[in-house]
């Protein structure tokens, strides 16, 4: 009798737990993993926990809470990435989706506000994923902007708003955020402040040393020096980000991706970069400067970029404005050249781990694999 009662009790406990657990294919609410403090300081750990839970129960949707979520890189997912036409390196990622299928991130008009060097979204080996109804911005942009206040032979005086904090180190200009992170730059480009577009017939000033000689004037303006510098008074000088470190949405080895009603106000690389993927639809996406923040630039590279992709690529009713490069690029095979043997033969290689080439030794019974 005791054994029977024990068995029935275990069954009842198991049944109760099963009833309480989310069912496969259901909705998961990020609010269940958040509290008021983490939402306003760093929602990153809650996002990691929620996505892990979604993968475990095969949830259909992760529903964000609306309002504003602040996200930092400190406790974000960390992985080394090779991303086409962006800089490789160790990345911190907020929403890291790996191997998910038939899954939607429902933004519910949530404003994702990032601080520091963090990539908002990464999709790897996914199928039938939708990201919708959210906006992305950063507390400090990866580029910097200053207003031209005076000009002379080989110099410009620039006034920087407080949001583009700067100082001088070894006689050269350096940009930082409020926490001391350095934001390197590698180019200057003049913009017409009134028309919000590159000034007429301006030159690109490339800075191989990723800096420029400068001094602080008594009135607080910064004077920069270069022999060929020129710009119109009142225009905006944009200091372009030196590297493409943190794209907005990265898609790799995936299929059936939909990006709907997403507003991308800033990121430190391309907006949407897809590689080795197929069937990608982007609808009503806006890559535009953040309203009310008086920025000239939206994002620091292409709005969208597709490399080694197949199937259908659809861009429908999108707005791409003031990004620092193309609205879209769609490439075919894209691999670095390793060796040029002669005018008719080259050796190319994949820049990504996991790709193999099978070749056969002189003995057909002894195949070998080379990575």
Placement of each model-derived feature along the sequence:
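Acidic Gly/Asp/Thr-rich repetitive segments characteristic of extracellular carbohydrate-active
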Residues: 30-63
């Amino acid at each position: 009798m005791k054994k029977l009662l024990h068995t029935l009790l275990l069954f009842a406990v198991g049944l109760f737990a099963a009833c309480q657990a989310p069912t496969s294919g259901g909705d998961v609410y990020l609010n269940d993993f958040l509290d008021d403090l983490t939402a306003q300081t760093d929602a990153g750990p809650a996002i990691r926990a929620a996505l892990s839970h979604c993968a475990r129960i095969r949830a259909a949707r992760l529903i964000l809470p609306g309002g504003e979520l602040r996200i930092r890189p400190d406790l974000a997912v960390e992985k080394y990435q090779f991303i086409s036409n962006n800089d490789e390196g160790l990345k911190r990622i907020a929403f890291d989706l790996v191997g998910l299928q038939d899954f939607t991130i429902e933004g519910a008009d949530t404003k994702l506000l990032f601080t520091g060097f963090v990539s908002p979204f990464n999709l790897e080996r996914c199928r039938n994923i939708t990201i919708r109804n959210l906006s992305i911005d950063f507390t400090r942009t990866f580029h910097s902007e200053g207003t031209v206040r005076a000009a002379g032979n080989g110099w410009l005086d620039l006034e920087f708003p407080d949001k583009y904090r700067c100082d001088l180190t070894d006689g050269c200009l350096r940009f930082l955020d409020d926490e001391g992170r350095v934001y390197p730059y590698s180019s200057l480009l003049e913009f017409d402040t009134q028309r919000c577009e590159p000034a007429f017939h301006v030159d690109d000033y490339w800075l191989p040393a990723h800096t420029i000689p400068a001094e602080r004037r008594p009135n607080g303006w910064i004077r920069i020096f270069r022999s060929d510098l020129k710009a119109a008074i009142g225009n905006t000088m944009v200091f372009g980000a030196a590297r493409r470190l943190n794209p907005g949405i990265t898609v790799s080895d995936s299929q059936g991706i939909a990006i709907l009603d997403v507003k991308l106000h800033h990121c430190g690389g391309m907006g949407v970069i897809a590689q080795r993927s197929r069937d990608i639809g982007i609808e009503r996406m806006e890559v535009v400067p953040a309203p009310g923040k008086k920025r000239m630039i939206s994002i620091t590279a292409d709005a969208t970029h597709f490399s080694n992709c197949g199937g259908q690529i659809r861009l429908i009713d999108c707005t791409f404005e003031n990004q620092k490069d193309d609205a879209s690029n769609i490439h075919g095979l894209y691999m670095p050249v390793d060796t040029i043997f002669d005018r008719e033969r080259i050796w190319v290689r994949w820049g990504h781990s996991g790709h193999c080439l099978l070749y056969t030794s002189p003995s057909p019974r002894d195949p070998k694999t080379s990575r």
